Protein backbone atom coordinates (compact mmCIF):
# COMPACT_ATOMS: atom_id res chain seq x y z
CA UNK A 1 0.00 0.00 0.00
CA UNK A 2 1.31 3.40 -0.87
CA UNK A 3 0.43 6.43 1.11
CA UNK A 4 0.11 9.77 -0.60
CA UNK A 5 0.94 12.70 1.59
CA UNK A 6 -1.47 15.55 1.28
CA UNK A 7 0.33 18.86 1.40
CA UNK A 8 -1.79 21.86 2.21
CA UNK A 9 -0.29 24.96 0.67
CA UNK A 10 -0.98 28.28 2.37
CA UNK A 11 -3.13 30.74 0.42
CA UNK A 12 -1.40 33.37 -1.65
CA UNK A 13 -0.66 36.51 0.43
CA UNK A 14 -2.99 38.55 -1.78
CA UNK A 15 -5.83 36.09 -1.18
CA UNK A 16 -5.22 36.27 2.58
CA UNK A 17 -5.19 40.06 2.45
CA UNK A 18 -8.39 40.19 0.40
CA UNK A 19 -10.13 37.89 2.88
CA UNK A 20 -8.99 39.96 5.85
CA UNK A 21 -10.07 43.25 4.26
CA UNK A 22 -13.42 41.83 3.22
CA UNK A 23 -14.01 40.68 6.80
CA UNK A 24 -13.24 44.19 8.05
CA UNK A 25 -15.56 45.80 5.53
CA UNK A 26 -18.60 43.68 6.30
CA UNK A 27 -18.20 43.90 10.08
CA UNK A 28 -18.02 47.71 10.20
CA UNK A 29 -21.27 49.65 9.80
CA UNK A 30 -19.80 52.91 8.49
CA UNK A 31 -19.01 51.85 4.90
CA UNK A 32 -22.41 50.22 4.51
CA UNK A 33 -24.22 53.42 5.51
CA UNK A 34 -22.04 55.54 3.25
CA UNK A 35 -22.71 53.30 0.27
CA UNK A 36 -26.41 53.37 1.09
CA UNK A 37 -26.03 57.14 1.07
CA UNK A 38 -24.59 56.98 -2.45
CA UNK A 39 -27.74 55.18 -3.61
CA UNK A 40 -30.19 57.33 -1.65
CA UNK A 41 -28.66 60.68 -2.63
CA UNK A 42 -28.22 59.79 -6.28
CA UNK A 43 -31.73 58.43 -6.77
CA UNK A 44 -33.54 61.05 -4.67
CA UNK A 45 -31.85 64.06 -6.23
CA UNK A 46 -32.14 62.55 -9.71
CA UNK A 47 -35.87 61.94 -9.28
CA UNK A 48 -36.36 65.47 -7.95
CA UNK A 49 -34.47 66.91 -10.93
CA UNK A 50 -36.57 64.86 -13.34
CA UNK A 51 -39.73 66.11 -11.67
CA UNK A 52 -38.56 69.71 -11.97
CA UNK A 53 -37.51 69.48 -15.64
CA UNK A 54 -39.88 70.65 -18.34
CA UNK A 55 -39.64 70.30 -22.12
CA UNK A 56 -42.41 72.10 -23.97
CA UNK A 57 -40.94 72.13 -27.47
CA UNK A 58 -38.52 70.33 -29.74
CA UNK A 59 -35.93 73.02 -29.05
CA UNK A 60 -35.83 72.83 -25.26
CA UNK A 61 -32.20 71.66 -25.44
CA UNK A 62 -32.28 69.61 -22.24
CA UNK A 63 -30.31 66.37 -22.01
CA UNK A 64 -32.60 63.82 -20.30
CA UNK A 65 -29.73 61.58 -19.23
CA UNK A 66 -27.98 64.43 -17.46
CA UNK A 67 -31.26 65.32 -15.76
CA UNK A 68 -31.80 61.75 -14.58
CA UNK A 69 -28.25 61.49 -13.26
CA UNK A 70 -28.15 64.88 -11.52
CA UNK A 71 -27.94 63.02 -8.21
CA UNK A 72 -24.41 61.90 -9.02
CA UNK A 73 -23.19 65.38 -8.09
CA UNK A 74 -24.01 64.91 -4.37
CA UNK A 75 -23.79 61.11 -4.49
CA UNK A 76 -20.13 61.20 -5.43
CA UNK A 77 -19.36 62.97 -2.14
CA UNK A 78 -20.58 59.91 -0.21
CA UNK A 79 -18.50 57.66 -2.49
CA UNK A 80 -15.47 59.86 -1.85
CA UNK A 81 -15.91 59.72 1.92
CA UNK A 82 -16.26 55.93 1.75
CA UNK A 83 -12.99 55.73 -0.15
CA UNK A 84 -11.20 58.02 2.28
CA UNK A 85 -12.40 56.22 5.39
CA UNK A 86 -11.39 52.83 4.00
CA UNK A 87 -7.80 53.92 4.64
CA UNK A 88 -8.28 56.83 7.03
CA UNK A 89 -9.90 54.68 9.71
CA UNK A 90 -6.82 52.45 9.72
CA UNK A 91 -4.69 55.41 10.79
CA UNK A 92 -7.18 57.08 13.13
CA UNK A 93 -7.76 53.87 15.12
CA UNK A 94 -4.18 52.61 15.02
CA UNK A 95 -5.26 49.48 13.14
CA UNK A 96 -2.70 50.19 10.44
CA UNK A 97 0.07 48.68 12.58
CA UNK A 98 -1.85 45.44 13.08
CA UNK A 99 -2.86 45.32 9.43
CA UNK A 100 0.71 45.65 8.21
CA UNK A 101 1.91 43.14 10.78
CA UNK A 102 -0.60 40.63 9.44
CA UNK A 103 0.30 41.49 5.83
CA UNK A 104 3.94 42.66 5.81
CA UNK A 105 3.92 43.24 2.07
CA UNK A 106 2.54 46.74 2.11
CA UNK A 107 1.64 47.01 -1.56
CA UNK A 108 -0.17 43.68 -1.37
CA UNK A 109 -2.24 45.02 1.51
CA UNK A 110 -2.89 48.33 -0.25
CA UNK A 111 -4.15 46.78 -3.47
CA UNK A 112 -6.21 44.26 -1.51
CA UNK A 113 -7.83 47.22 0.24
CA UNK A 114 -8.50 48.83 -3.15
CA UNK A 115 -9.91 45.61 -4.57
CA UNK A 116 -12.25 45.05 -1.63
CA UNK A 117 -13.47 48.66 -1.84
CA UNK A 118 -14.13 48.39 -5.57
CA UNK A 119 -16.69 45.58 -5.40
CA UNK A 120 -19.26 47.15 -3.03
CA UNK A 121 -18.81 50.62 -4.53
CA UNK A 122 -19.42 49.19 -7.98
CA UNK A 123 -22.60 47.49 -6.75
CA UNK A 124 -23.83 50.61 -4.95
CA UNK A 125 -23.06 52.73 -8.01
CA UNK A 126 -24.94 50.35 -10.28
CA UNK A 127 -27.96 50.44 -7.96
CA UNK A 128 -27.81 54.24 -7.76
CA UNK A 129 -27.59 54.68 -11.52
CA UNK A 130 -30.27 52.06 -12.22
CA UNK A 131 -32.61 53.74 -9.73
CA UNK A 132 -31.99 57.14 -11.27
CA UNK A 133 -32.51 55.82 -14.78
CA UNK A 134 -35.77 54.14 -13.76
CA UNK A 135 -36.98 57.36 -12.13
CA UNK A 136 -36.15 59.25 -15.32
CA UNK A 137 -37.98 56.71 -17.48
CA UNK A 138 -41.08 57.03 -15.30
CA UNK A 139 -41.07 60.80 -14.77
CA UNK A 140 -39.54 62.49 -17.82
CA UNK A 141 -42.15 61.48 -20.45
CA UNK A 142 -44.76 63.24 -18.33
CA UNK A 143 -42.56 66.35 -18.32
CA UNK A 144 -42.51 66.66 -22.10
CA UNK A 145 -39.60 64.40 -23.02
CA UNK A 146 -41.57 62.60 -25.73
CA UNK A 147 -41.14 61.66 -29.40
CA UNK A 148 -43.12 64.77 -30.30
CA UNK A 149 -40.31 66.87 -28.83
CA UNK A 150 -37.52 64.84 -30.39
CA UNK A 151 -36.93 62.33 -27.59
CA UNK A 152 -37.70 59.06 -29.34
CA UNK A 153 -36.29 56.79 -26.63
CA UNK A 154 -34.69 57.08 -23.22
CA UNK A 155 -33.02 53.67 -23.60
CA UNK A 156 -30.97 54.35 -26.74
CA UNK A 157 -27.30 53.46 -27.03
CA UNK A 158 -26.16 56.88 -25.83
CA UNK A 159 -28.32 56.58 -22.72
CA UNK A 160 -26.89 53.16 -21.93
CA UNK A 161 -23.38 54.55 -22.38
CA UNK A 162 -24.25 57.40 -20.02
CA UNK A 163 -25.48 54.92 -17.40
CA UNK A 164 -22.46 52.61 -17.68
CA UNK A 165 -20.09 55.58 -17.61
CA UNK A 166 -21.75 56.98 -14.50
CA UNK A 167 -21.21 53.68 -12.67
CA UNK A 168 -17.54 53.65 -13.63
CA UNK A 169 -17.19 57.32 -12.67
CA UNK A 170 -18.47 56.81 -9.12
CA UNK A 171 -16.21 53.80 -8.65
CA UNK A 172 -13.18 55.74 -9.86
CA UNK A 173 -13.96 58.59 -7.45
CA UNK A 174 -13.96 56.16 -4.52
CA UNK A 175 -10.59 54.73 -5.59
CA UNK A 176 -9.14 58.20 -6.16
CA UNK A 177 -10.18 59.05 -2.61
CA UNK A 178 -8.55 55.89 -1.29
CA UNK A 179 -5.27 56.91 -2.91
CA UNK A 180 -5.41 60.45 -1.52
CA UNK A 181 -6.15 59.15 1.98
CA UNK A 182 -3.19 56.76 1.80
CA UNK A 183 -0.94 59.64 0.73
CA UNK A 184 -1.98 62.17 3.41
CA UNK A 185 -2.97 59.73 6.22
CA UNK A 186 -5.59 62.06 7.65
CA UNK A 187 -9.28 61.57 6.90
CA UNK A 188 -10.36 65.20 7.29
CA UNK A 189 -7.53 66.50 5.12
CA UNK A 190 -8.15 63.81 2.50
CA UNK A 191 -11.88 64.54 2.33
CA UNK A 192 -11.15 68.25 1.94
CA UNK A 193 -8.62 67.61 -0.82
CA UNK A 194 -10.88 65.26 -2.76
CA UNK A 195 -13.98 67.45 -2.53
CA UNK A 196 -11.91 70.49 -3.45
CA UNK A 197 -10.49 68.65 -6.44
CA UNK A 198 -13.97 67.66 -7.57
CA UNK A 199 -15.94 70.85 -7.04
CA UNK A 200 -13.42 73.68 -7.38
CA UNK A 201 -12.52 73.13 -11.05
CA UNK A 202 -16.10 73.76 -12.29
CA UNK A 203 -16.47 76.78 -10.00
CA UNK A 204 -13.22 78.35 -11.18
CA UNK A 205 -14.07 77.56 -14.82
CA UNK A 206 -17.38 79.39 -14.45
CA UNK A 207 -15.68 82.46 -12.98
CA UNK A 208 -12.81 83.01 -15.42
CA UNK A 209 -13.44 85.33 -18.35
CA UNK A 210 -11.01 83.64 -20.72
CA UNK A 211 -12.99 81.06 -22.72
CA UNK A 212 -9.87 79.08 -23.64
CA UNK A 213 -8.78 78.81 -20.01
CA UNK A 214 -12.30 77.87 -18.91
CA UNK A 215 -12.42 75.10 -21.51
CA UNK A 216 -9.00 73.84 -20.41
CA UNK A 217 -10.15 73.70 -16.79
CA UNK A 218 -13.19 71.71 -17.86
CA UNK A 219 -10.92 69.29 -19.70
CA UNK A 220 -8.64 68.58 -16.74
CA UNK A 221 -11.08 68.73 -13.82
CA UNK A 222 -12.20 65.22 -12.83
CA UNK A 223 -15.82 66.20 -12.23
CA UNK A 224 -16.41 68.31 -15.33
CA UNK A 225 -14.45 65.95 -17.59
CA UNK A 226 -15.76 62.74 -16.06
CA UNK A 227 -19.43 63.66 -16.12
CA UNK A 228 -19.24 64.40 -19.84
CA UNK A 229 -19.83 60.67 -20.14
CA UNK A 230 -23.47 61.39 -19.22
CA UNK A 231 -24.04 63.55 -22.29
CA UNK A 232 -26.44 62.22 -24.92
CA UNK A 233 -27.08 65.51 -26.75
CA UNK A 234 -24.65 68.15 -27.98
CA UNK A 235 -21.73 65.73 -27.70
CA UNK A 236 -19.76 67.47 -30.45
CA UNK A 237 -19.66 70.71 -28.46
CA UNK A 238 -18.17 69.13 -25.32
CA UNK A 239 -14.58 69.96 -24.29
CA UNK A 240 -13.83 66.21 -24.52
CA UNK A 241 -15.65 63.20 -25.89
CA UNK A 242 -17.54 61.21 -23.23
CA UNK A 243 -14.97 58.42 -23.02
CA UNK A 244 -12.04 60.84 -23.12
CA UNK A 245 -13.56 62.62 -20.13
CA UNK A 246 -13.82 59.36 -18.23
CA UNK A 247 -10.22 58.69 -19.19
CA UNK A 248 -9.22 61.93 -17.43
CA UNK A 249 -10.79 60.63 -14.21
CA UNK A 250 -9.00 57.33 -14.67
CA UNK A 251 -5.68 59.19 -14.94
CA UNK A 252 -6.41 61.19 -11.77
CA UNK A 253 -7.30 57.92 -10.01
CA UNK A 254 -4.17 56.14 -11.20
CA UNK A 255 -2.04 59.07 -10.05
CA UNK A 256 -3.68 59.14 -6.62
CA UNK A 257 -3.28 55.38 -6.17
CA UNK A 258 0.36 55.61 -7.21
CA UNK A 259 1.03 58.39 -4.69
CA UNK A 260 -0.77 56.44 -1.99
CA UNK A 261 1.15 53.26 -2.77
CA UNK A 262 4.50 55.08 -2.72
CA UNK A 263 3.67 56.82 0.56
CA UNK A 264 2.69 53.50 2.14
CA UNK A 265 5.76 51.75 0.77
CA UNK A 266 8.42 54.24 1.81
CA UNK A 267 7.02 56.01 4.88
CA UNK A 268 6.75 54.60 8.38
CA UNK A 269 3.27 53.49 9.32
Language-model features: where?
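Helix-capping/transition residues at the boundaries of transmembrane alpha-helices
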Residues: 24, 88, 99-101, 177, ...
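A short amphipathic helical element positioned immediately N-terminal to and/or at the very start
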Residues: 14-26
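Transmembrane helix boundary and interhelical loop/hinge segments in multi-pass membrane proteins
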Residues: 83-107, 114
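Generic structural signal for small/hydrophobic residues in well-ordered secondary structure
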Residues: 21, 103-105, 180, 186, ...
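Membrane-interface capping segments at transmembrane-helix boundaries
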Residues: 261-269
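Secretory targeting signals
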Residues: 2-12, 31, 35, 39-84, ...
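Transmembrane helix segments
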Residues: 187-223
Amino acid sequence: MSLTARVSLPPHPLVQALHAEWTKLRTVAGPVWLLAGVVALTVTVGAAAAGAAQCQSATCGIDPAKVSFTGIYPGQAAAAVAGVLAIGNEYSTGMITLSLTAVPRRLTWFFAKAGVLTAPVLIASALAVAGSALAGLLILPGRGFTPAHGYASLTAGADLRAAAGAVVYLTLIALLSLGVAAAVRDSAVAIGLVLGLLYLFPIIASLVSDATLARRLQQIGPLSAGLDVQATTGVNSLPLTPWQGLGVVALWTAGALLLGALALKFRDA
